[in-house]
Amino acid sequence: MNRSRRLALFCLGAPLLLQACASVAPSRSFDGDQAAASQQYTGRFSANYVRYGRDEGVQGSFRWEEQGRNVRLDLVSPLGQTLAVVTATPSGATLDLPNQPPRNAPEVDTLMEEALGFALPVAGMRDWLHGRATQGAPARTTRDEQGRLATLAQNGWTVRYVAWQDAAAQVPRRIDLARDAGSNPLSVRLVIDPRTP
């Protein structure tokens, strides 16, 4: 079934799906470090990838919450259904999908790739969302006229900072990420909502 036909069927059945929508398990608590400052980002995402030799795509909204070394990432469809909840802590990663038992692994990328067909680089995003390279990993960078990151190549990803928010804090507005992994290329666009005081 082609992508447009699946989308049309999904949209036609959306009212029924919303009524029968299963929720994902309640939020897992983070390991220790509860007193650490919390950072939150919300916005929209789109991902284009190849799965089983076919071009695929997904889009929706995201909520990123970071507390110390712990991260929770919620991916939500355009109709408000939870696609996935990812929790990453120093002790491991959990991926929660609707109507499925939680999946656990030492790191989240493999979990996402197997379950969703694409994996957001959660480890790198901890720094990239803040407009900086990850420390301790080799990186090639370029900067714009204001001294902010313009491009970053690190850990197999190319990160392009397309726009920055108009704020005193240097917070990206749009980030394009690309990974050329041979037969499994992946491109992701993140549009980050302005922060509210």
Swiss-Prot record:
Q: Establish whether keyword Signal is in the entry.
A: yes
Highest taxon of the source?
Answer: Bacteria
Fetch the SUPFAM superfamilies from UniProt. Prokaryotic lipoproteins and lipoprotein localization factors
Q: What gene is behind this protein?
A: lolB
Please list which residues make up the signal peptide: 1-20
The source organism is: Cupriavidus necator (strain ATCC 17699 / DSM 428 / KCTC 22496 / NCIMB 10442 / H16 / Stanier 337)
Q: What is the protein's known function?
A: Plays a critical role in the incorporation of lipoproteins in the outer membrane after they are released by the LolA protein.
Q: Residues with N-palmitoyl cysteine lipidation?
A: 21
Task: Please verify whether the record's keywords include Transport.
Answer: yes
Name of one Pfam family that matches: LolB
Cellular location of this protein? Cell outer membrane
Q: What is this protein called?
A: Outer-membrane lipoprotein LolB
Q: List the disulfide bonds.
A: none
